[in-house]
Amino acid sequence: MHKVDQHDAPLDPNFLGAGRCLTDDQGRYTFKTIKPGAYPWGNHPNAWRPNHIHFSLFGDYFASRLVTQMYFPGDPLLQYDPMYLGAPDHLRDCMVSQFSLDVTQPDYALGYVFDIVLRGAKATRFE
């Protein structure tokens, strides 16, 4: 899917590389996807991005867009990622999802929770 992906694995014809969902009246959302893998990104020799998912949030207007990234807990590449390391220490935990058995679907899919906070001391870091 990615323009520089040279892997010979078969592509899933149902995966478009992007999705869209709306929040409910409480601001909650849910979606299903594959867990992305790490990839080399050429920033410097042997540079890899950790597993992550980009989120684009839109308000009432298309121009009111916020972008952030969600990382997965325990990823060994976080300690090398300049996007993650560029965040103040106290905000880094807000960038990492939390594994949750409550949203895990038995025999099907692991579940993670990622709360996006728009304002306040624990606001999610946006790009």
Stretches found by the model and what they are:
Residues 1-127:
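Beta-strand-dominated extracellular/periplasmic modules and repeats
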